[in-house]
UniProtKB/Swiss-Prot annotation:
GO CC annotations on file: plant-type vacuole
Coiled coil: none
Binding site for Ca(2+) 2: 65, 67, 69, 76
Location relative to the cell: Vacuole
Alphabetized UniProt keyword annotations: Calcium, Metal-binding, Repeat, Vacuole
Pfam families recorded: EF-hand_7
UniProt-annotated binding residues for Ca(2+) 4: 139, 141, 143, 145, 150
Binding residues annotated for Ca(2+) 3, in chain numbering: 103, 105, 107, 109, 114
UniProt subunit comment: Calcium and pH-dependent interaction with NHX1 (increases when pH decreases, better at pH 5.5 than at pH 7.5). Also interacts with the CPB protein At2g18750.
Protein name: Probable calcium-binding protein CML18
Gene that produces this protein: CML18
One annotated GO biological process: regulation of monoatomic ion transport
Job description of the protein: Potential calcium sensor that modulates ion selectivity of NHX1.
Amino acid sequence: MSCDGGKPAPAKLGDEQLAELREIFRSFDQNKDGSLTELELGSLLRSLGLKPSQDQLDTLIQKADRNNNGLVEFSEFVALVEPDLVKCPYTDDQLKAIFRMFDRDGNGYITAAELAHSMAKLGHALTAEELTGMIKEADRDGDGCIDFQEFVQAITSAAFDNAWG
């Protein structure tokens, strides 16, 4: 979901992106029938760090299921996610600049203290509970800090959540 610093995103997914999507799709297609059930689609989205509610999942399936069979085939899956994958809310340069703003000591990681300080500076003071929740949600490897990849994933998840309601 990375963008080439400042260049506009392409209108279509490239071959490499399609191959990655196909691999992801196949790994969640439990019975290998070429389609995803609601449960399989939910698992796939959660593996990407997203947390769709049941209503969001129902809406996604209704939107994707063009042949009305209650399942999501690969072509339907691509049609569903392609618009969000080809548009990038931030360029790589913007993401790096935002990350550097939060990573006050420049060590490549955002700690809870750095996050709290930066959010307070932005006028969004966090409670201890909010801070813990944000770190826990973004910290994929469990080391207590947020590295750049985890930061990008968190931003991407937030953008997806905003786009999908």
